[in-house]
Amino acid sequence: HLQEAGATPVQEIAYAMATAIDVLDAVRESGRIPEDEFTQVFGAISFFVNAGIRFVEEVCKLRAMTEMWETIGRERYGITDEKALRFRYGVQVNSLGLTEVQPENNVQRIVLEMLAVTLSKRARARSVQLPAWNEALGLPTPWDQQWSLRMQQVLAYETDLLEHEDIFDGSHVIESMTTELREAAQAELDEVLALGGAFASIETLKSRLVSSMTDRTRRIGAGDQVVVGVNRFTESETAPLGGSEAILRVDPAVEQMMIDDITSWRASRDQAAVDAALANLRSAASGDGSIMEASVALARAGGTTGEWGAVMREVFGEFRAPTGIASASGAAGGLAAIAERVRALPGGPPRVLIAKPGLDGHSNGAEQIAMAARDSGMEVVYAGIRSTVDEIAATAVEEDPDLIGLSILSGSHLEL
């Protein structure tokens, strides 16, 4: 989801490759995989890529990634097996560009983004995940999801788009842009590797992603990046699709049903077997045992994902991802005068607490609000994603903010 987090095409290529290199280097250096089996490990690596609205650029991005991955395999790891060298990726077309305003326009956006990852045979996605037209409003209904599935089926079974060799081979425009993206991404990758790799430089990479997203937000706000229905062609007839009412409404009783199911499951299982499996998992995680084997054994004994996660947190602690807010470069621009006035307010600048409750990792909204508040001269408190309600309340008591902003996904805010 690098593009969803703000990555430019160059950053998306480079950071994805850097992450894969870190994983492969760690596997090779562990000594657990015989040298003659490393080709299988390399061939098992797959990527999850985003596809955006800039069709030609997206086609070239995937062709560049295909070429770079093969080069990395041959030159860094000595892979010669042609099948193992293939760039394997699944794709979700870009939800970031879907709009709440005139959401019917999202249909053509989704189709164009799907075409970008399917038309070039040499760089074609192995699997495609399409969002629904109304996901900027909330959770889609089963019918909305079916509509997105039918888009893929029409492409696969009614058109001839998948019947030919790569239709972009020989195009000067495609080849030139592919080369340009590959060279720029290689320079970015070299810089990340010089910093110690993706894992060692995660705070730097996150900061760059936040800065890129801030720049995108500024361009849209200024009208430099056109979004139809949002900053151009904003007049609209009344849409018959239902707007904010045309989303899935989850029955609040479902939560209690799930709790009852877990309670019933735990009451009917062999608790002694679960306890033994949990102890085995804890031992494997604490030592050199196989966490995967212990995890499978726990599942077969009837353990839950919550119990598995509790053991992992007990052994390894809980990772709190960097927010990227403190060091990201903002786009203050016309906010400079406002920031000066805000900082000069009697009693000091307002303090705002930005909080992200829930389990989803879509942090763009919270980050961009935090960046805008910071660039407006406010003091910002933001601890990142996946905060519990109790944690947010405790932070509010401790920090005593003047304003609390909650970033919530899936239309949950409509009930507030």
Predicted feature locations:
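Helix-rich catalytic cores of soluble enzyme domains
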Residues: 1-116, 130-150
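Short, hydrophobic beta-strand segments
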Residues: 45-53, 175-176, 351-356, 401-407
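Glycine-rich phosphate/diphosphate-binding loops that line cofactor/substrate pockets in enzymes
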Residues: 39-41, 283-289, 338-350, 394-400
